[in-house]
Amino acid sequence: MNLSTRHEPISELFNYPSSSHEWTDYALSSEQLQDFDENGFLPGIRILDPTQLEQLKAELDKVIDPEHPGHSLFYEFHLNEAEEENRVLFHALGAWQLEPALHDLPWSPALQMAAYQLLGGAVRLFHDQLFVKPPEHGGIVAWHQDYSYWTWTEPMAHLSCWIPLDDARVENGCLQYIPGSHRWGLLPITGLTGDMNAASATLDDRQRKALETPFAAEVPAGVGVFHHPLTLHGSTENLSSRPRRAIVINLVRDGVRSNADILADKETHNFPILPQGTTLSGQYYPLLFQPDSELGERRTEIPLAENSAAPSTDQV
């Protein structure tokens, strides 16, 4: 069954707030929002507890098998996207369609509330990603900006939440960020694998200097890191004896549209590209959080990011 037809939680992975008051328990503080505005990322948001982690790891083990009955539903599936010799980087998109817990992860209350505050409006799923770096030979993900791959959607009103399924440390290839790089503007695509520092060729001297002092998002399993679509980020090899598995949930503010005309002659794999000018909605872009219905009058009590990952309301 293709679970993308189900636009509500289908398992008991999460306990959902039953009132607007309970939603406020998940709200980010003004200080956290300020950190996001300043740095372009925000670590330390608990998304999954140990039981939920085990459910997701079990489902990841199932869907990574190309013989999984739902395999054809993946938007992309790369058993090894690494370019380096003797390195492995599993990467896939679209797993939310295949298994119940993977389907329900975007409906995490903590994820939904943070996304609303950081995007400044109603939230839709854009797409998910799975990353696996096996022990001792996990490959890199080079420095990049997410939106450089997403310019087929506009305006820029996007957000990502990176959720490790294993404790993430430098030695097993945790995500790393360049603080403040979300203010550098849109950079050219220089590749996701191969040369970790390929993006440096597109930077000025000050920006190249900033690459020398990245912030390593060392977080426990289940603790998410949110980042802006222009924040430069990447991850080094996993040379440890432990795996580094992670799920990324990519989100958009409701109202983002397709700019698919720029994709002419470009490989889009099995991604559900909508016609030019069409608002992202329908089967593959479910509405996750509607602040008016979930928060009601309490909406005014919830702080929003001043320089959010989305443009102002009149631009969307």
List each language-model region with its residue ranges.
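Short, solvent-exposed loop/turn segments at secondary-structure junctions
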Residues: 49-50, 131-133, 148, 168, ...
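Non-heme Fe(II)-dependent double-stranded beta-helix
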Residues: 2-39, 45-143, 149-152, 190, ...
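Short helix-to-loop capping/linker segments positioned immediately adjacent to catalytic or ligand/cofactor-binding
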Residues: 100, 113-114, 148-151, 163-166, ...
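Short, conserved beta-strand element in jelly-roll/cupin
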Residues: 151-170, 218-219, 250-253
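Non-heme Fe(II)/2-oxoglutarate
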Residues: 2-22, 66, 72, 192, ...
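Double-stranded beta-helix
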Residues: 12, 16, 168-232, 256
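Conserved hydrophobic/aromatic beta-strand scaffold that supports enzyme active sites
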Residues: 25, 41-43, 160-164, 214-216, ...
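Short, surface-exposed loop/helix-turn segments at secondary-structure junctions
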Residues: 145-146, 195-211, 243, 262-269
